[in-house]
Amino acid sequence: MKAFLITLIFALFTMGATAQEIYKIVYQNAEQVLNNPASGVTKARIAQFKVSQLTYLRQKAFETMPEVTDRFLDVQAYYLSEFMTFYQSELVKSNKETPEERAKKVMIFLDATVSNPLFGDTDEETIYAYIKEGTELTPFSLDTDWQKALAAVKAQLK
């Protein structure tokens, strides 16, 4: 299912999808997971983060940018999905590692989101809401340039 979604998103991205098509697909898929009682806790927590992040992205973009393009929202949504997929695959791989190694890997992802802000938002209560709890499966900043964050993580994990 994930592979299909990523392939679909990539196909739409490269074919010049209609306005906000990728953003809408990622958002709607996350909402479907949240609204499906059969979704497991892990899937629901990841979906909740995606919905929160995409809602924040759209709201902040319209607040701070004179002109928000569909491409801007689509690119961020695409790289958010790529980042989350890569994060999940790295967590699965790290099951065989020590708890310290696993925590170090999570910190690489967390640091990439904090170190690559998109808007420079100073409202730490909002942007770090998923970090401050300390128990989140997705301990990431909402104010993130997902394309840069993904590149930063991949560079560190080479």
What are the language-model segments listed below?
Residues 1-22:
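Bacterial Sec-dependent N-terminal signal peptides
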Residues 12-15, 25, 29, 51, ...:
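Intrinsically disordered, low-complexity regions enriched in small/polar residues
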Residues 20-67:
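Immediate post-signal-peptide N-terminus of mature secreted/exported proteins
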